[in-house]
């Protein structure tokens, strides 16, 4: 027991006497200190005493797309941790091709009496989807928050990154490196984040390179799938149109763009620069390390939980969109345009 107390005390940064008071449920310990000791127990793999186990305030559903794209597990982790800190138990429900649909997962969660639901990149982001499903859910009295996507037809809080600003950051960076032929690889046009990225990309290219909107959309925008293979196909088409830089709507697509360049005998970033979007876990360790636009995942995840808990508590936030600014992270996949090298 003494060894265990010492381990926990060292991990939590407190005395063994304080650990003992927490484990025995004694008063006189600050809430933050108590939480540090409990966190140390969890990190070290010790089981919490029965008296210290939190009683769940209820279940909260989290519906995400497939988890192959690492940004979705990252967001799920932030949301799950934030819910747990507030005493709720997260229930992760994942959509997979050929598996359960969003509507089926929603019905399952409602049947289990969840206190609320957070949707990530769901049908609310698809402009062709029927938004009445969300109004029916509201009529059932189930609070919900929608992440990544927006529809004026749905009365609910939305949490989004600023997709237009993300494209402005990427294009401005590439123009500063001397690139004048910049392509955009992204998903199907029916999705709201895709439409917003196109708007930001077209506007910035117009402003900084003087191209017409028609030329940009016709020659420099390539739709594909949000996968490595989709990025590879889109980038191949854009490089074939003499693009020396490609901005991708996800890091997975960007990895596909790098593969496309290499298969064409080109070097990244010497011959082609590539910019991703998300800053997914481990993306800094690719070859080359990927320049990307970082989605503010921690802030978005925490805001989604805070907003949902306000809905659950009966003091709902405004039914509008909360937009979070992205950040450009420059690494090794972007460099000066080929024709710019060696100039004084």
Swiss-Prot record:
HTH lacI-type domain: residues covered: 1-54
Organism: Streptomyces coelicolor (strain ATCC BAA-471 / A3(2) / M145)
Pfam family, one: Peripla_BP_3
DNA-binding region (UniProt annotation): 5-24
CDD domains: HTH_LacI (cd01392), PBP1_AglR_RafR-like (cd06292)
Keywords from the named record: DNA-binding, Repressor, Transcription, Transcription regulation
Domain of life according to the entry: Bacteria
MF terms in GO: DNA-binding transcription factor activity; transcription cis-regulatory region binding
GO biological process: regulation of DNA-templated transcription
Name by which UniProt lists this protein: HTH-type transcriptional regulator MalR
Task performed by this protein: Transcriptional repressor of the maltosaccharide utilization operon malEFG.
Gene3D superfamilies referenced in this protein's UniProt entry, alphabetically: 3.40.50.2300, lambda repressor-like DNA-binding domains
